[in-house]
């Protein structure tokens, strides 16, 4: 159990440190966004100022708390093809009929490192001027190492 906690803490620390050395971008709202990954359809960023340990435990025999729940904001920017795919997957073409309108989304997420789960607490979709196009409420908790992560 103790080895698993060390491994989880090590993975989490590695993840957070790798995030801090990535390129920084600024959104229209003035927040600093750090680049995570990109492909032909999507670019992913996170806001370092939004990362908070919302729950932690103090394992016996240690002097530092172990994060058991982390919340943060992530941003997804869309190419035309990515916007088209997102609109189709969310079945919101009646709300956003033109994929060129969809510029980016900002999601609030919760990560539970020990369970390797991630949950979208909410996500808001914007046009290029920052106008809200559509919002989605809380999603299902998903394993970060499964295909289920990409299904919603």
Question: Which role does the model predict for each range below?
Answer:
Residues 26-107, 111-152:
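N-terminal secretory-pathway/extracellular module detecting exported/lumenal segments
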Residues 11-20:
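Bacterial N-terminal signal peptides
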Residues 2-12:
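Bacterial N-terminal signal peptides that target proteins for export
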């Amino acid at each position: 159990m103790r080895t698993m906690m060390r491994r989880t803490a090590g993975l989490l620390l590695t993840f957070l440190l790798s995030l801090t050395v990535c390129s920084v971008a600024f959104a229209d709202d003035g927040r600093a966004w750090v680049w995570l990954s990109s492909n032909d359809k999507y670019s992913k960023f996170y806001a370092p100022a939004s990362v908070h340990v919302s729950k932690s435990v103090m394992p016996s025999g240690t002097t530092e708390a172990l994060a058991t729940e982390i919340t943060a904001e992530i941003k997804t920017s869309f190419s035309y093809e990515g916007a088209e795919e997102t609109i189709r997957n969310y079945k919101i073409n009646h709300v956003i009929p033109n994929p060129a309108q969809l510029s980016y989304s900002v999601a609030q997420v919760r990560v539970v490192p020990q369970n390797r789960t991630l949950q979208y607490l909410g996500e808001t979709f914007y046009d290029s001027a920052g106008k809200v196009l559509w919002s989605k409420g809380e999603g299902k908790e998903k394993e970060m190492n499964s295909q289920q992560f990409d299904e919603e």
